[in-house]
Amino acid sequence: MTHAPISPVVLVILDGWGYRPQRSDNAIAMAKTPIMDSLWEVYPHTLIRTSAKDVGLPEGQMGNSEVGHLNIGAGRVVPQELVRISDAIEDGSIQQNQALLKLCAEIRPKKSKLHLIGLCSEGGVHSHLDHLLGLLDLAKVQGISDVCIHVITDGRDTNVTDGMPAIKRIQEHINKIKLGRMVTLSGRYYAMDRDRRWDRVEKAYNVMTSDQGIDGRSITEVLQAFYDQNITDEFIPPTRIAPGAIEAGDGVIFYNFRPDRARQLCYALTMPDFEDFDRDLISPLSFVTFTQYDPKLPVDVAFAPQNLNNILGQVIAQQGLKQFRCAETEKYPHVTYFFNGGLEKPFEGEVRELIPSPKVATYDQAPAMSAAAVTTSVCGAIEQGIYSLVVVNYANPDMVGHTGILDAAMKAVETVDLCLAKLLSSVNKLGGTVLITADHGNAETMVDESGNPWTAHTTNPVPLILIEGEGRKIPGHGGDVQLRDDGRLADIAPTILEILSIPVPVEMTGRSLIKPAEVEIKASRTPVRISL
């Protein structure tokens, strides 16, 4: 028996597509985007909040892809690990953390070294500098005599030379408590790769695990020398500053709280069956990660995962419906692992497709990235007519925005706009409904107040457009849907469930963005037809 094709709900996440009314240095406003412009003009639209307390982060903290997708998929504001860990340091409860105390108890009698690895940044996206300083204080209280800090500089979620003030702040704290020394220096480009570019990780690993090739200069002198060569924080080559290699019997705390860019270095340091580059396993190591990077890692976890029940993907599966997720490499974990509340395993009926990202050093060299292939995959899935929910992420505005190169970011934005035309054509064939939004801002701000390239995210709101399909009419509105203007990312999942006529579970504390229907039903809106 042949079933009629399903009219899907398609959630399109334009990663890093924020809203800023000023046109100057705004890659989104300056780019040619006829598709988004026409959709914004014709269809119901609003701006939603993606930062700070609206996504479970501290006041003033910019959002990011992990947090954004987690909040979207959960349908509620999820307290973030940044806040959990900061609170534990502030209230002193970190001094009772069992995983950290166990590590200290194992290395203290042997007077072994404690290694602190993480992104030395106040960006708050992968880590926070306050957490490193809190660990130094913990080590002091616990009587650890030798603490080696492996500095990873940012330059992506912060300004490109914010590594220098971060290092100076670390040194001030070291001088204050008389404990700790910075022994290696590496840009996140090497130490925090997440795309299996193992040659980069290998360079960072070798520097951290060997005392050979000590530079001889202070860490600030080394960093300034790289700046003088126009090599900024993200791209600092791994450099040994002082003795203090990771050796058998030592303790290691990896204090990044976001898993995706910490996993590969952790695999190299801990996995017995690691084969991605030649190395001898350093064993035994007492190893703690701040959060759970991967259940397979042979490490202790200081802050266990929060269990989220009745998230969007789970509710769709419970209804016996099929769903499709697609993104290229850079954002694939976000539409799968993070969207599913930190669960690696797909739900029943959830199909995933990973499109490889281009192998380039930085994405200004390929601003189109793999958007065309992502679009082809998603259109094929939509036209199968078997999926009730389709989730797709376009990485371009965010990944190219991170380069700080305006022209490239404009090309990235224009690429995505063209892809939307093809995607909407496929959705129109089945009468589906489309939600177009973003997880956070980025490409709308390419220059900071000092005139320097801005490579980080923003706290700006993002657009949300609802394109109601002929085959997926929202009950009770007669084609005249109105959207709230006070929404946030947590409200997207309840909105999708309302469109699908599925009850919203009590765990979802977000509210549908669709305003209650007015008594008077107005004429249906004439749909935009995209000419290809």
UniProtKB/Swiss-Prot annotation:
Binding site for Mn(2+) 1: D398, H402, H457
Cofactor(s) named in the record: Mn(2+)
Enzyme Commission number, as recorded: 5.4.2.12
Bound cofactor: record note: Binds 2 manganese ions per subunit.
Binding site for substrate: H126, R156, D157, R188, R194, R258, P259, D260, R261, K331
Reaction it catalyzes: (2R)-2-phosphoglycerate = (2R)-3-phosphoglycerate
Keywords: Glycolysis, Isomerase, Manganese, Metal-binding
Residues the record lists as binding Mn(2+) 2: D15, S65, D439, H440
Cellular-component GO terms for this entry: cytosol
One GO molecular-function entry: manganese ion binding
Annotated catalytic residues: S65 (phosphoserine intermediate)
Family: Belongs to the BPG-independent phosphoglycerate mutase family.
HAMAP family membership: GpmI
Name of the protein described by the UniProt record: 2,3-bisphosphoglycerate-independent phosphoglycerate mutase
Biological source species: Microcystis aeruginosa (strain NIES-843 / IAM M-2473)
